[in-house]
Amino acid sequence: MLRSVTLPFGGHININYEQTTPSYDLPGRRWVMSSVETTGGYKENGAIRSRNTFEYSGGYRDRRERDFYGFKQVRTNQIDTENGDRLYRYSVQTYGKNRDYYTHGLVTSEYLYTADGKKLQGAVYDYDLKTLAVGHNTADAVVFPALKTLVQSNFDEAGGDSLSVAVSNTYDDYGNLQGYKETTTGYSLEANINYHKIADKYIVGVPSHITVSSGGKTYRERSTKVDGNGEITEIMLHNGDKPSVYNMTYDGYGNITRMTKPENYNHQRMFYAYTYDDRYHSLVTSVKDAYGYSSSTAYDGLWNAPSVTTDLNGQKMEYTYDALGRQMTIRAPYEIESGQPFTIRYEYFPAERKAHTIHYSKEGNIDTYTFADSLMRAVQTKQTGVVWSGGSNQKVSIVSGRAVIDAFGRNIAAYYPMTESHGNIGTYNHATGDLQAKTEYDTHDRTTSVTLADGS
């Protein structure tokens, strides 16, 4: 079993396991994941360790299918590693139908609780087993566990009151969503969807008409037409007696070759015509509009990424890539004309966990360094700057303000940017700087207070 993962930049993920206790429903023991702990990062950026633990109950093995159907309940504990490894929150996922062949992997409810058991959020799911239209042979029938209803709730931690949104779905004989209704206090929203049916080509999932309404009033209505291959050739946006119509044509590979937009007050219609490459038939090489303007793109054959783009004014942009497919240079029209090797150049230093960007400037290039921690998170940037000091301009490195996070990835403190000697621009700065603000959260992850450096 996998016990640990070492990330490319040096961070670690450690996984622990334990065995379940045998029971009648689950004879024998099973190894289950008991905890996951991630370590890494810089201490000055806050928490360097996060941890979740897991508990399982209600495991079931079907004796007829000779297969394990999963646990009825899984609890995930969120541990506050910055506060003595105390329990902060926990969530419970329930698989209430884990004794059925078709539904044993479906969540029937999930709730988030505070450490002392007060509900924060919840969702309840109900499913309907539908037999899809596959012919008259019942032995070949396909059963689809369709989500029939979903009720999502947010709870007030203090009073226990809740605000809920209920969603109900209906489906057609092919399992397509046909009706959607969202209901909450004093509000409801409905969507009804129909589909094209090209049975001989098994195309039954392309919407033909959709209506969105509330309280008997239609707020959005769309309809489509398709060709014999199921490709949408027309989209109509119903706007009373003045519908907006889009038309599309396709090539033999299914690419859009022409898209025509709705007409204006003079009955004129804008269109865009697309041309594709001759090798892959998927890369757009030119675009032409109704005015005769055109733009084009040439591609790097190794990465299928743009190498030269030409806009409608004939101005070019050039792009190059390194041996790993990463952006290496970008050259804009002015630099192409003046013969400069780049407008922007990118350099990568994974061993030092940093990237370097150089912006060309006649007055001197602008360097930008981005530093990552061992968990591969960007934590600091530095940029060339000029400040007035001692009666003259001084070239410095401007260090981004530090963001400090807690054990759950929330920003709890922010610090102002600072300057340093330009000679240190390529080295990570461990200094913290001046405090800007501290932020506190509730167990819903909502901001409850922001305190500035002066205490206000």
Per-region residue spans from a language model:
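Beta-strand elements of repeat-based all-beta scaffolds
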Residues: 2-6, 13-16, 25-27, 32-45, ...
